[in-house]
């Protein structure tokens, strides 16, 4: 009986202890949930009350909570401080604690890997890339049983290597990710990894590897049956790569079917409902880009195509649409990719403005690019060479040849991109040709490096055609007219094959000029009239000015007084428009940008008293 009584007493004590423990746990849970609720209320207030949110989360620690709650609270604090404050030191401390504690807790993957992901982001922001890499590698190593996080961390480390310009390591990681996705049965995420790898291979110009990869991607995308928005977004990614591949190669005509498919694809996406995607396979929980970002991207590649083809009014129309969409998006979204899209759009429309005779507007837009680059060192690093190239083109348009040379030389120093290098050298050579005998040795060296008959450095059809044009221009200025005609006919053949309208117009008018000098007025007229028509269609103000002057002189020589008078009137109108624009551009304070050749973009510009450049070339 005594034993039974003792057992009963023990059982009662145990039950009492268990009840006390349960009550304590319930109380702990209630205070924790209360603090968490307050913190979330303050975080989501309008405007957010971040200081109060942080106080509520910090109040968790004096209660000596269990490890799970402690680790999660450190993660929440680190996340709030990282995203909403500039206190990176405290954010780092909390995230490091979350990562350390969570590794000791079994089945705590979400907290563990989110802490690793955020912490590596913070390290990169602080330029501690060497701390971010091993952290991500360890997280990747221990996340193989968690498909979503394993894929996400692989993408993150690949992106880090890409930002460091280590594309080989990035491609290797994306290859690992593609194979892992295949093993866990996620064809969708496998396609994302492969398309990302294809994008990097295009950047590296490894075209022999790109073609089979894109073919495989095309098959995977077409065969995958899943959420319609995810499927269409894969198709957009695939088609964007194809279109940019064609445009990089200067194949403006060949790209049209792909571009049309891309435009139809984005129209399809815009009609689909944004239902929340909840795939059964956790490895499928990825999305390439938001729908709105994809729309801007399709506008962007359409602008690139229109610019290369010489449909400048169309380029203007799509740029306006894209910039309007970007302004709306940037009110709600601070994603860095939006600023990149904006800069690339502005770079293209600036070139359009310079061709259409709107130099003052182009200069103000160059200044806008400078301001965007001032806000982001990475953006400036990626676009500095393009910015100096645009300034060089502006300098040519206002006849500041010494400044043009300085800008192009600076751009060459800042780029290792082959296509951009060839574009800059082609334009620099044209500056030296116009300058006469001042730079003969340098000019000969440049022309040899972009010799389209022998070892042209890039595969771009458009740039090779432009190199033939520059050789023709040089031969014309040297008085070697037969040689000039051969080069220009080669340009015409290549530009006609791919609908490169600006090159066609420039080649026709220069051929017309050669025939005029040689006294072959009929053949000259046969070149100049279509050049004028094409230049009006683009519209290209410089070619129109040149063509109208030639038509005036041709008609005078042939005794066609009325036609000569009409052409003279056209020439006068074009001259006045260009002269007025020239004066306006050179009077802007931003015109001082032409002297900037070193360091980050200047913050302010001093206003000038008036233009200080020669107008002789316009009259």
UniProtKB/Swiss-Prot annotation:
Main location: nucleus
Gene: Mau2
Ligase found in the keyword field: no
Alphabetical list of SMART domains matching this protein: TPR (SM00028)
Location of this chain's protein in the cell: Nucleus, Nucleoplasm; Chromosome; Nucleus
GO BP annotations, alphabetical order: cell division; chromosome segregation; maintenance of mitotic sister chromatid cohesion; mitotic sister chromatid cohesion
GO cellular component: chromatin; nucleoplasm; nucleus; Scc2-Scc4 cohesin loading complex; SMC loading complex
Species classification: Eukaryota, Metazoa, Chordata, Craniata, Vertebrata
Disulfide bonds: none
Organism, as annotated: Mus musculus
Protein origin, superkingdom: Eukaryota
Protein name in UniProt: MAU2 chromatid cohesion factor homolog
Keyword Repeat attached: yes
Family (UniProt): Belongs to the SCC4/mau-2 family.
Subunit record text: Heterodimerizes with MAU2/SCC2 to form the cohesin loading complex. The NIPBL-MAU2 heterodimer interacts with the SMC1A-SMC3 heterodimer and with the cohesin complex composed of SMC1A, SMC3, RAD21 and STAG1.
TPR repeats: 113-146, 385-418, 465-498, 505-538
Keyword tags: Cell cycle, Cell division, Chromosome, Chromosome partition, Mitosis, Nucleus, Repeat, TPR repeat
Renumbered residue ranges of the record's region Sufficient for interaction with NIPBL: 1-121
Database matches in PANTHER family: MAU2 CHROMATID COHESION FACTOR HOMOLOG
Tissue expression: Spermatocytes and oocytes (at protein level).
Entry-linked Pfam families: Cohesin_load
Role noted for this protein: Plays an important role in the loading of the cohesin complex on to DNA. Forms a heterodim. eric complex (also known as cohesin loading complex) with NIPBL/SCC2 which mediates the loading of the cohesin complex onto chromatin Plays a role in sister chromatid cohesion and normal progression through prometaphase.
């Amino acid at each position: 009986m005594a034993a039974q009584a003792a057992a009963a007493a023990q059982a009662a004590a145990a039950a009492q202890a268990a009840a006390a423990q349960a009550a304590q746990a319930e109380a702990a849970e209630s205070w924790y949930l209360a603090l968490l609720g307050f913190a979330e209320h303050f975080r989501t207030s309008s405007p957010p009350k971040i200081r109060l949110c942080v106080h509520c989360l910090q109040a968790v620690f004096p209660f000596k909570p269990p490890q799970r709650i402690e680790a999660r609270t450190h993660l929440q604090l680190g996340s709030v401080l990282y995203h909403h404050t500039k206190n990176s030191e405290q954010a780092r401390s909390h995230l490091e604690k979350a990562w350390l504690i969570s590794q000791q807790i079994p089945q705590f993957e979400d907290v563990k890997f989110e802490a690793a992901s955020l912490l590596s982001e913070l390290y990169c922001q602080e330029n501690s890339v060497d701390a971010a890499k091993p952290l991500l590698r360890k997280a990747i190593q221990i996340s193989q049983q968690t498909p979503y996080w394993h894929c996400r961390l692989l993408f993150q480390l690949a992106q880090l290597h890409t930002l460091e310009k280590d594309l080989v390591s990035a491609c290797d990681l994306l290859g690992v990710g593609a194979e892992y996705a295949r093993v866990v049965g996620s064809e969708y995420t496998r396609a994302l990894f492969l398309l990302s790898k294809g994008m990097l291979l295009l950047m590296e110009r490894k075209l022999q590897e790109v073609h089979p990869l894109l073919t495989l991607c095309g098959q995977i995308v077409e065969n995958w049956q899943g959420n319609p928005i995810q499927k269409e977004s894969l198709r957009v990614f695939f088609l964007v790569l194809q279109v940019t591949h064609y445009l990089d190669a200067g194949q403006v005509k060949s790209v049209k079917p792909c571009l049309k498919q891309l435009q139809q694809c984005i129209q399809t996406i815009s009609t689909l409902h944004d239902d929340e995607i909840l795939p059964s396979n956790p490895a499928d929980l990825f999305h390439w880009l938001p729908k709105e970002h994809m729309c801007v991207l399709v506008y962007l590649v359409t602008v690139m195509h229109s610019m290369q083809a010489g449909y400048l009014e169309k380029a203007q129309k799509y740029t306006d649409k894209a910039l309007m969409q970007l302004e709306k998006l940037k009110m709600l979204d601070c994603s860095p990719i939006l600023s990149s899209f904006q800069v690339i759009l502005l770079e293209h429309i600036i070139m359009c403005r310079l061709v259409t005779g709107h130099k003052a507007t182009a200069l103000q837009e160059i200044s806008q690019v400078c301001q965007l680059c001032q806000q982001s060192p990475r953006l400036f690093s990626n676009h500095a060479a393009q910015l100096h190239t645009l300034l060089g083109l502006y300098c040519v348009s206002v006849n500041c040849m010494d400044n043009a040379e300085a800008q192009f030389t600076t751009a060459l120093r800042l780029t290792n991109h082959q296509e951009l290098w060839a574009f800059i050298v082609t334009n620099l050579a044209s500056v030296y040709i116009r300058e006469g005998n001042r730079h003969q040795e340098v000019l000969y060296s440049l022309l040899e490096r972009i010799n389209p008959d022998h070892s042209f450095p890039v595969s771009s059809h458009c740039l090779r055609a432009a190199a033939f044009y520059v050789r023709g221009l040089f031969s014309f200025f040297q008085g070697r007219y037969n040689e000039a005609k051969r080069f220009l006919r080669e340009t015409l053949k290549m530009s006609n094959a791919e609908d490169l309208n600006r090159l066609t117009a420039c080649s026709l008018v220069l051929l017309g000029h050669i025939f005029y000098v040689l006294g072959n007025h009929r053949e000259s007229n046969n070149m100049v009239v279509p050049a004028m028509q094409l230049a009006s269609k683009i519209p290209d103000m410089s070619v129109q000015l040149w063509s109208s002057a030639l038509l005036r002189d041709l008609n005078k020589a042939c005794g066609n007084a009325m036609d000569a008078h009409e052409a003279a009137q056209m020439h006068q109108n074009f001259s006045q428009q260009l002269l007025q624009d020239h004066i306006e551009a050179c009077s802007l304070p931003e015109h001082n940008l032409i002297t900037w050749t070193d360091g980050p973009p200047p913050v302010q510009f001093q206003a000038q008293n008036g233009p200080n450049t020669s107008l002789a070339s316009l009259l």
